[in-house]
């Protein structure tokens, strides 16, 4: 019994060493910074495209503002009022753009989705790229069907709220509790979908669930920690004044991408490590074994910071 426990502890420690080596090799913080930069450039265009899709359907009138407020209040900790005001101002300015400018907004939105696709496929060591037509169809589907699904869920929520059964105290209390858990459920579902669907290779559901759970827990802890830091140490307001929302948003987006990529690294490394353990005969797993595994997987330091060049 004691030997089994020691063996499992060795396996767990070996996996952590392998994961650490993988994260260092992939330069996760550099990739997160790149993704944060692309996100900030594409955030307003993406939201504008999503809102414009919703505005084409009268049944979803007003849903765009509700989605925007919900996302900011539940996924941007602290200073949400300042961030929301800045985003609304930026988005309102896009209404003055010409057709050519609107086309550039769409291109910027696709650029963000393409960057996510490229970064995650690099983590999974996918060398075979999707066909351009397939990729374009996938991005188009995300930008069109995504807003419709969100709008439909909001409409369904409003309908359920208006039902007479909601007057019952027990049902109403359960419904409010469910709504309180909704942000956590949505973030977990988004992580699972991201880790299952984006890589251009088969990913085991159990691995995606573990990676999504890890990323979801980190995300919730980060929201609390970041909010505490912002409220307890508001030096950013003294330094930046009215522009304080910009660095707050940038730091938070950067932190979010670190969490997303850590979850992806966990999901991808589970498959590699599990396959390696299957062929391992000896019960003594040492650091030298991890070095051999990392060399086998090609985890050798590279001077390049571009995923496409590795």
UniProtKB/Swiss-Prot annotation:
Q: Which subcellular locations apply to this protein? A: Cell inner membrane
How this chain sits in the membrane, per its record, is: Multi-pass membrane protein
Q: One Pfam family, short name please?
A: Virul_fac_BrkB
- Transmembrane region positions? 34-54, 97-117, 136-156, 178-198, 207-227, 242-262
Q: Which InterPro entries match?
A: UPF0761_bac, Virul_fac_BrkB
Listed under GO cellular component are:
plasma membrane
Highest taxon listed in the record's lineage:
Bacteria
Keywords of this entry: Cell inner membrane, Cell membrane, Membrane, Transmembrane, Transmembrane helix
- Family statement drawn from the similarity comment of this UniProt entry: Belongs to the UPF0761 family.
HAMAP family on file: UPF0761 (MF_00672)
Report the protein name in the record: UPF0761 membrane protein VF_0100
Q: Which organism does this sequence originate in? A: Aliivibrio fischeri (strain ATCC 700601 / ES114)
